[in-house]
Swiss-Prot record:
One of its GO terms (molecular function) is RNA polymerase II complex binding. The modification N-acetylalanine is found at residue 2. The modification Phosphoserine is found at residue 212. Residues 260-292, 325-358 are annotated as: Disordered. This is Parafibromin. It comes from Rattus norvegicus.
Length: 531
């Protein structure tokens, strides 16, 4: 008898059906348990005195059913199904043997003990099929019974037709029943009608009560809703209720402008009113506050006449010269001009002198062949994981002209505690649309390789060399570790970031190194920006 691996190979080559029923795998007349061991040795076992391990039937069968998946996806799905995984070094050799590309394999242990399959009984199956076929055959006795039933039914219907009441046999109710019996029937009908009407009235009264209760509840609810105030937060304000977002923004700007120019418009002087002299205005009496020296007030000037003491005088706000010159100098002293309060809108700078932005700008290549594009920039720089642009396109992501990423970092406080803060960075791929004042905020650029990427940039040399650009902006180059470095990048001052094709767990250290390098550069050259 052949081993289970050979039978599986034969069925796979001939494209025969393999039935999995419960914990058994059925190959025609033979069946094996799922956990039966084959004679294919697991890679890495049986060396240096270690015992040999063999792949089970369900692990190889699961590989055949999921051969179209990539190995990482296959491993995750097998772990979910709690099935042993076929290791990557054995995958190609095992599939070649099962598909008939190779007649044998070096990993097949011919001396391994063979598991004998169970032979299924075909006679039992054949007997069951015969019973099912016999059950499907119509019996002659059953057909005879059906025919007799139809004849009886037809005869009964014919008899019913013959016994139909004729119009000559109809008599009046007074001839068939007594008057007393007819009166009793009428009394029962009237009593039933009265009870029915009474029930309907009760239902109407109940419905009326419920309706009045609902109306009262509606009035109370309307009163409560009229006193409600919508809780407005930063998030709810930014969520527009209509298609035109400008309506919400303009309403907010109008309210802010009205608050800055003055809450009460009636306080502004009318344009046609005559100006009033401020000296003619009646001074409002200032209420006297409590003074602990009120009990020592002098009764009159006659008691201090000989001392020449001015009990109402003060040296507050006077210079030394005015004090030494005496009271005459104090009389000629003019009061200091009081500062005139200005409205809030005048205290702030005008719109054309608004404060510039402190958000740093990162420029990335616009070419679709670049590893970092506008589709995956947020995944790379914010989430610190590499997602190819093609995969983002398959997910239906739309390309934006620019994006704003939120970088999370730990910031040390004076007490020695660290708090997590979020710093915004603006990412663009069209630098020619930047304003002249925006170039001072450009802190990093991702270089692709060709020099034409910097065409039209400031600080570009006449020969087209971007050497001076890299002296003012920190440059980075993102590539795979197996790809050869571009010759232009080798001779430029560019920090190279290498990614692995398959090891996605190494992406985070690479992008953390990018942020550390950029932070050191900004501390030295761009300390006025927010980072």
């Amino acid at each position: 008898m052949a081993d289970v691996l050979s039978v599986l190979r034969q069925y796979n080559i001939q494209k025969k059906e393999i039935v999995v029923k419960g914990d058994e795998v059925i190959f025609g007349e033979f069946s094996w348990p799922k956990n039966v061991k084959t004679n294919y040795v697991v890679w890495g076992t049986g060396k240096e005195g270690q015992p040999r391990e063999y792949y089970t039937l369900d692990s190889i069968l699961f590989l055949l059913n999921n051969v179209h998946l990539s190995h990482p996806v296959y491993v995750r799905r097998a772990a979910t199904e709690n099935i042993p995984v076929v290791r990557r070094p054995d995958r190609k050799d095992l599939l070649g043997y099962l598909n008939g590309e190779a007649s044998t394999s070096a990993s097949i242990d011919r001396s391994a003990p063979l598991e004998i399959g169970l032979q299924r009984s075909t006679q039992v199956k054949r007997a069951a099929d015969e019973v099912l076929a016999e059950a499907k055959k119509p019996r002659i006795e059953d057909e005879e019974c059906v025919r007799l039933d139809k004849e009886r039914l037809a005869a009964r219907l014919e008899g019913h037709k013959e016994g139909i009441v004729q119009t000559e046999q109809i008599r009046s109710l007074s001839e068939a029943m007594l008057v007393e019996k007819i009166a009793a029937i009428k009394a029962k009908i009237m009593a039933k009608k009265r009870s029915t009407i009474k029930t309907d009235l009760d239902d109407d009264i109940t419905a009326l009560k419920q309706r009045s209760f609902v109306d009262a509840e509606v009035d109370v609810t309307r009163d409560i809703v009229s006193r409600e105030r919508v809780w407005r937060t930063r998030t709810t304000i930014l969520q527009s209720t209509g298609k035109n977002f400008s309506k919400n923004i303009f309403a907010i700007l109008q309210s802010v402008k009205a608050r800055e120019e003055g809450r009460a418009p009636e306080q502004r002087p009318a344009p046609n009113a005559a100006p009033v002299d401020p000296t003619l205005r009646t001074k409002q009496p200032i209420p006297a506050a409590y003074n602990r020296y009120d009990q020592e007030r002098f009764k009159g000037k006659e008691e201090t006449e000989g001392f020449k003491i001015d009990t109402m005088g003060t040296y507050h706000g006077m210079t030394l010269k005015s004090v030494t010159e005496g009271a005459s100098a104090r009389k000629t002293q003019t009061p200091a001009a009081q500062p005139v309060p200005r409205p809030v809108s005048q205290a702030r700078p005008p719109p054309n002198q608004k404060k510039g932005s402190r958000t740093p700008i990162i420029i990335i290549p616009a070419a679709t062949t670049s590893l970092i594009t506008m589709l995956n920039a947020k995944d790379l720089l914010q989430d610190l994981k590499f997602v190819p642009s093609d995969e983002k396109k398959k997910q239906g992501c739309q390309r934006e002209n620019e994006t704003l990423i939120q970088r999370r970092k730990d910031q040390m406080q004076p007490g020695g505690t660290a708090i997590s803060v979020t710093v915004p960075y603006r990412v663009v791929d069209q630098p020619l649309k930047l304003m002249p004042q925006d170039w001072d905020r450009v802190v990093a650029v991702f270089v692709q390789g060709p020099a034409w990427q910097f065409k039209g940039w400031p600080w570009l040399l006449p020969d087209g060399s971007p050497v001076d650009i890299f002296a003012k902006i920190k440059a980075f180059h993102l590539k795979y570790d197996e790809v050869r470095l571009d010759p232009n990048v080798q001779k430029w001052d560019v920090t190279v970031l290498e990614l692995s094709y398959h090891k996605r767990h190494l992406d985070r250290p690479v992008f953390l190194r990018f942020w550390e390098t950029l932070d050191r550069y900004m501390v030295k050259h761009k300390s006025h920006l927010r980072f």
